[in-house]
Swiss-Prot record:
This is Ammonium transporter. The keyword Transcription regulation does not apply. Disruption phenotype: Cells grow poorly at pH 5.5 and not at all at pH 5.0 with ammonium as their sole nitrogen source. They are unable to transport the ammonium analog methylammonium, and thus probably also ammonium. In the absence of nitrogen source, cells lacking this gene do not show degradation of TnrA, which is entirely soluble. The chain crosses the membrane at residues 7-27, 44-64, 96-116, 125-145, 158-178, 227-247, 254-274, 277-297, 352-372. One of its GO terms (molecular function) is ammonium channel activity. PANTHER family: AMMONIUM TRANSPORTER MEP2 (PTHR43029:SF10). One of its GO terms (biological process) is ammonium transmembrane transport. It is a multi-pass membrane protein. Functions as an ammonium and methylammonium transporter in the absence of glutamine. Required for ammonium utilization at low concentrations or at low pH values, when ammonium is the single nitrogen source. Required for binding of NrgB to the membrane. Interaction between GlnK-AmtB complex and TnrA protects TnrA from proteolytic degradation. Keywords: Ammonia transport, Cell membrane, Membrane, Transmembrane, Transmembrane helix, Transport. It is found in: Cell membrane.
Length: 404
């Protein structure tokens, strides 16, 4: 065990933990004032629910030795997860690796809530969160990072393009379709863009822990991830704003923040495998394709992805996974692989197989989970509750005295 790496990873885990409250602000600013507390509660309660699931059995199912589909139960209740280095890093405590990975599981579950904002009942969300973290997140994490079949295939996902972003985006799309549109349609008027700006800034800050920490040690790969993360976020702003300026004639603050998130999502699977120049291309295209996902794709198919969980995370994560297959190079990370632009066409096909499998699995299992939840609890607020606002009807409080 090395003290330097331990302190580094401890700090990275705290940064990723901070992303979930940041997400609450980011989402909270984009909803109506009568729904800001209920929206924040989805993110905050994810910390509570998923933390418990992770300690009891989530971590062992994701990372314990098992088969190519799911981990075993030897680390259930964190049995054997102590302060000595574990299987995934020989320089940090096993328990620290567990906590770092827990923050990913928490954030992934919270991201989904953006898709059904302003209409899902809180109790139904809690039950859904338990089941989804257990039955969807843990298998996908095992496939990619825990010794499962995607990792064995040779597909690359440095920090969670598949595990975090595609899985949360696709799950959000399923819930948006099943719950249907909001009572007053899909148009949403953000009630406080300063909240969204501050939340976006916290998310960007936390993302350094998310991507850089995925190196698990403070080395050259970590530094590439650090540079690429910031560069792709900046390029994502440029890509989004450029398209927005051309189409809508005005660049917006919401567009700038959304572009940063799009760039960050897109670089996530590639952060420790590509050059800084590639991160510019990945970020710019990420901003542009997520703009298309948020505006054109959603309009074409008519689903109400309220805060664009699929438009940002599903679309951005998909592009990031494909981009990894194009731009990855062993000159950055010898543990990775060369992509198409560096002479190896096989990686891009491995990336596509991994992405497609994640889409299919997450879509089907999320659909089954939400149908099971509906057998026990009503999923959606009534028209009257939606009209009054979920802050008051679900939680008995208001964020503002005039919040209607």
């Amino acid at each position: 065990m090395q003290m330097g790496d331990t302190v580094f990873m401890f700090f990275c885990a705290l940064l990723v933990w901070l992303m979930t409250p940041g997400l609450a602000l980011f989402y909270g600013g984009m909803v109506k004032s009568k729904n800001v507390l209920s929206t924040a509660m989805h993110s905050f309660s994810s910390i509570a629910i998923v933390s418990i699931v992770w300690v009891l059995f989530g971590y062992t199912l994701a990372f314990a030795p098992g088969n190519s589909i799911i981990g075993g139960l030897e680390w259930a209740g964190l049995k054997g997860v102590g302060f000595d280095p574990g299987d995934y890093s020989d320089t940090i405590p096993h328990s620290l690796f567990m906590m770092f990975q827990m923050t990913f599981a928490v954030l992934t579950t919270a991201i989904i809530s953006g898709a059904f904002a302003e209409r899902m009942r809180f109790g139904a969300f809690l039950l859904f969160s338990v089941l989804w973290a257990s039955l969807v997140y843990t298998p996908v994490a095992h496939w990619v990072w825990g010794g499962g079949w995607i990792g064995q295939l040779g597909a690359l996902d440095f920090a969670g393009g598949n595990v975090v972003h595609i899985s949360s985006g696709v799950a959000g799309l399923v819930l948006a379709i099943v719950l249907g549109k909001r009572k007053d349609g899909t148009a949403s008027s953000p009630h406080n863009l300063i909240y969204t700006f501050l939340g976006g800034a916290l998310i960007w800050f936390g993302w350094f822990g998310f991507n850089v920490g995925s190196a698990l040690t403070l080395d050259g790969v970590a530094m590439y991830a650090f540079i690429n993360t910031n560069t792709a976020a900046a390029a994502g702003i440029a890509g989004w704003i450029l398209v927005e300026w051309i189409i809508n004639k005005k660049p917006t603050m919401l567009g700038a923040v959304s572009g940063a998130i799009a760039g960050l999502v897109a670089i996530t699977p590639a952060a420790g495998f590509v050059t800084p120049f590639a991160s510019i291309i990945i970020g710019i295209i990420g901003g542009a394709v997520c703009f298309w996902g948020v505006f054109s794709l959603k309009k074409k198919f008519g689903y109400d992805d309220a805060l664009d969980a699929f438009g940002l995370h599903g679309i951005g994560g998909t592009w990031g996974g494909i981009a990894t297959g194009l731009f990855a190079t062993t000159s950055v990370n010898s543990a990775g692989a060369d992509g198409l632009f560096y002479g190896d066409a096989s990686l891009i096909w491995k990336q596509i197989v991994a992405i497609a499998a994640t889409y299919v699995f997450v879509f089907i299992v999320t659909f089954v989970i939400i149908k099971i939840v509906s057998l026990f609890l009503p999923l959606r607020a009534t028209e009257e509750e939606e009209s009054l606002g979920l802050d008051l009807t679900m939680h008995g409080e208001k964020a503002y005295q005039d919040s209607m």
